[in-house]
């Protein structure tokens, strides 16, 4: 089957490439969008050959439309592409995707308002009326017959379960594959799942609960039914356990119809949601962007978890607008807040595309260094020094206010530390400054040695002496008497030596 790049040719291709992707945007549709759409249809087990005609595009749109509300962005983009392609095939002039969607919506409303033609058996009436959803198709006689699911559809469903297990993306896949199916077809899809029997048992319990609720809200009529009237389906009939395929088709095609297939499919989706929540226990509140994680990967994880959340579409929209920005890393959060609350997802991803790369890291580092230098200069200018500033002094001339490298005086020879020539101060091996013979430090360039007497002129007090009173005279006389007594005692104990004869015998100096 492959990617169909030859869906449009000639003038239709020119018309296709003239349509804008968004209202007021600059990007237009290209041939690569057709190739992508055909591959996506193959992935959803749909026939890409239907893209060649307007009727085929309408069938694909009708099949994908029920899953658009809970589908991903890729599924919505596929439906938008098919809508534009339908307008090109039908020669409906449109300028962008939104106009194409509006045209299709208007056409569907007009078709619903038209009265049904009584001659349903003719070929013209069959072509003019919208065909029933697959697998209920209309034969040549105008009768609705059942066409079972193809093995290819069942194989696609089994592969999704094997590859994705019960990730959130299996729900829109199930919705796309089971569109218009009868309860018997849905049971065939469930029976093809070989593994995950615990999940299948949970699904059966949910179906039984919904069937019991149906029986409670739709009680059976009392008494026998009139001849020719069909009985109302019970919960087990909707689940396909107590009803035949003919009864299911009759209920779905009666007037008014009873969509037992859609009801049963809704029950299965409820059970799949519970299983997905069990297999994916991560809450949307726990999805946060890592410091080095690209914004694109973070958005993928966010929407994957959001799909498994059991909430209405309004709540999911609020989560997207609030949590997507709140749980981003600081770099992306700063960019997203600058965009404003009305930014689209495309604008967010474009703005945060380079975050985390080498260029962004270099820019952030440069800004941080510039801020640090600015803060340092402001700190110096304001003079926020708590301690006393140390005055700088030149080693060359000895003056204060500048350093030796900025000194304008002639450069002095020798070491600035010890005064000797032959080496510099950085290579000086002397422990201290040059010392004089008294061991005191002495600069050889100015000043004088420490052994010179340092005379300082001190001012003597010029105040008159204190007046003496009687008590002070008594104290002074007592002090003098005590001193004289002490001197007499020392003289009596240690008589003065008048010569050295008592110590050395004959005094040599006296001879």
Curated annotation (Swiss-Prot):
Residue ranges, annotated region (Interaction with membrane phosphatidylinositol 4,5-bisphosphate): 73-77
Chain ranges for the short sequence motif Nuclear localization signal as given in the UniProt record: 26-32
Composition bias type Basic and acidic residues, residue spans: 105-119, 472-490
Organism superkingdom: Viruses
Motif (Nuclear export signal): 16-22
Residue numbers spanned by region Interaction with host AP3D1: 12-19
Stretch list, region Interaction with host CALM1: 8-43
Ranges for region Interaction with Gp41: 7-31
GO biological process, any: viral budding via host ESCRT complex
Region (Dimerization/Multimerization of capsid protein p24): 279-365
Zinc finger (CCHC-type): 392-409, 413-430
Gene3D superfamilies from the UniProt entry: 1.10.1200.30, 6.10.250.390, Human Immunodeficiency Virus Type 1 Capsid Protein (1.10.375.10), Immunodeficiency lentiviruses, gag gene matrix protein p17 (1.10.150.90), Single helix bin (1.20.5.760), Zinc finger, CCHC-type (4.10.60.10)
Additional note from the record: HIV-1 lineages are divided in three main groups, M (for Major), O (for Outlier), and N (for New, or Non-M, Non-O). The vast majority of strains found worldwide belong to the group M. Group O seems to be endemic to and largely confined to Cameroon and neighboring countries in West Central Africa, where these viruses represent a small minority of HIV-1 strains. The group N is represented by a limited number of isolates from Cameroonian persons. The group M is further subdivided in 9 clades or subtypes (A to D, F to H, J and K).
Protein name: Gag polyprotein
